[in-house]
Amino acid sequence: YHTHSQETYADYPENSEADVIHLGECLAKLLREKGYNVYHDESVYDYRNGKLDRSAAYTYALDGISGLLQKYPSIEVVLDVHRDGVSDGTRLVTEIDGTETAKIMFFNGTSMSPDGPIEYLPNPNLKENLAFSFQMQLLAAGKYPGLTRKIYLKGLRYNEHVRARSALIEVGAQTNTYAEAKAAMMPLSDLLDQVLTGE
């Protein structure tokens, strides 16, 4: 799913597919080819009543994904696919098998403030969420050096509490092309597969 469905890449709107929803479908297709049952939620959570509202989007997204998890309780992994926002001169690109590939970043909410846990944002899956990101980060360092940026930790929850294996993944930034972002889906699907199968 995509809390921020309106996030696009450098070649949008000329390339009408250069957005995170199309990117998510690409990842879903690759995972299906590996034998996974994938539900790709293409709902728009960040554009309501004719206005872009990225802060309220997490509330809307929680309602949406909670409903889906009730409907499909066998879902074990929940991925929120985004693209980052960086300064215009920043290029988040590496090369994998000769292909220019957008760098990815695992983004983890800690449900913590400097004073301790944020009581109104409990996350019983916090350790498992962090372990999931760290497993993929470590695997990527060995198999796809340069693919991942540092794991980003922030104080809120970002709906990662819904499953033990939840991840918010930033794929490139607004300065990347869609082709670069799409190229990152193959190694990302491979990392997910290896972590989930333990192989």
For every predicted segment, state its role.
Residues 1-76, 84-90, 186, 196-198:
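N-terminal catalytic or cofactor-binding beta/alpha core of small enzyme domains
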Residues 34-37, 73-77, 101-103, 146-147, ...:
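Loop/turn elements at helix/coil->beta-strand transitions in domains of secreted/extracellular proteins
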Residues 38-41, 77-80, 105-107, 150, ...:
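Structural recognition of the beta-strand scaffold that forms the well-ordered cores
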Residues 44-51, 116-123, 170-172:
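Active-site-proximal beta-alpha loop/turn segments in soluble metabolic enzymes
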Residues 65, 88-94, 151-157:
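Alpha-helical scaffolding within the catalytic cores
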Residues 87-124:
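A short, glycine/acidic-enriched catalytic loop
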Residues 125-152:
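Active-site-adjacent substrate-binding region
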Residues 146-199:
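Active-site-adjacent mobile loop/cap segments within catalytic or ligand-binding domains
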